[in-house]
């Protein structure tokens, strides 16, 4: 029986793997996200399906990255919604299938799409019509490893996983044996208002972890968990984060105050997308395959995302947690937040 963390606020059930009744807001969406990273950081990828029934569209993103090589990206923010009760998507450029094999235990992703080749990550924010194209085929399965983590106050859950299958780029096929995470959420999400950091990975000793911080100006109990090697998932109290950005807007590093294992995340390869709101505002979303280095020397790999709505540079991007812990962390590294 899979372990499900119980915060005492709402009860996650197998049925929550299915689609939910839409809410009233224009930006109400149902989101499914899947990622993976090879144990040596040599390849990583992610898929996200976002359904906007009140906006009459679906978003579909898929990206494969390999450090030092161009990103392979599928990004369609105006796809037609799937048929009633379905999460399968078909457009002129892609055929995507999503299957819950066993609720809260395993899921499969299939994709056959025309992707673009991005030698420079920032090109994802420009028009992609003239970019080189390549066929991208995914056949991957996510199997739960350690438990399931519902967020305390939001209809959302995260599941650390073992990931297996194949990735084909053009005529080259790579067998995947990796680790990753999948999540599912439903509700109104305004990408153009709130900035946040979300991070998930696995260290070399087998410890998996997750943490999220929204830049809302004050501290709350941020969602965070860890899974010890061959153990079960448990909630962590006290996560917070700080990020340094370059002049180009891309993150250079994030300091993650993961309780019991403080980490530094360094992006190895970016997989960004841009999003335009119904009224024309633009948000950037520079997701990245990262190398994580724990203060005790352990190294691992995974994914971090930084949502950047209009005005994002003024949102702080610094520790929103126990100030004594954050101040000690800064002092220990010369006060530079790096």
Model feature map: region roles:
Residues 1-338:
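Structured soluble/peripheral alpha/beta segments that form catalytic or ligand/cofactor-binding pockets
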